[in-house]
Amino acid sequence: MNWNAHGAKILDMIRNSKPLVHHITNLVVMNDTANVTLHLGALPVMAHAVEEMEEMTSIASALVINIGTLSKHWIEAMFKAGKTANDKGIPIILDPVGAGATSYRTETCHRLLEELSVSVIRGNLGEVSILAGLGGEVKGVESVSAGGDAVDVAKALAAKQNCTVSITGKEDVISDGTRTVLVDNGHEWLTTLTGTGCSSTTAVAAFSAVERIPVTAAACALMCYGLAAEIAAPQAKGPASFKVAFYDALYNLNAEQIEKGGRVREVS
């Protein structure tokens, strides 16, 4: 596959069709993820009330479930939205923020994965390792250690849950247990801003809304997301100016930039 050309094609499809991405996401990143959704060309909605979950999810093209700021009412909404998404064939993208940091988070993730059919799990190495049963350590929401390298961990959880797993880091790893893809795009300044991992989950959801092969959607999304960061970095003097430049780069990202700058390789 020509990953760069296909990524450009998917981005064009998003911009033309403007799919609705429903987020049940955390309070820290809500505004940022809404903006990233818009800059990619999709439409965001952040609805959390249990009373409207079925209706709102039914009109969406993808659902993000992000556990960053959990409460029992939000968990109820997650299950209701997730079951509606499964019934309607709408892809679910799960961001297990801080899984492993507390038993509440870890148990909630396991319940979600047991009761819902998730299309893509997007997390850091520690979170994914813990969910795969390989051990690891998460401090707050940051990965400290894991029970293996990213490729092995992604494959393990993908096989366990029968879904696609994306581990973001210096090099992004995407695997469905059979196919494994590496994305080398990105910039270290993404780590200076809170919520950039959560926003990458939003990118995966936007791409999943129009590309129904999860590995392809996730790899192309993370390629475009990382490439925008690379384009933005030379224009920035620090984290604040980088954020503005990054948003502009996402909004203005075009096929020529993607075809020249995307770095994706399939390793199995």
From Swiss-Prot:
It holds the Pfam family HK. Keywords: ATP-binding, Kinase, Magnesium, Metal-binding, Nucleotide-binding, Thiamine biosynthesis, Transferase. Substrate binds at M46, G195. CDD domains: THZ_kinase (cd01170). NCBIfam families: PRK09355.1 (NF006830), thiM (TIGR00694). This is Hydroxyethylthiazole kinase. InterPro entries: Hyethyz_kinase (IPR000417), Ribokinase-like (IPR029056). It comes from Desulfatibacillum aliphaticivorans. The gene is thiM.
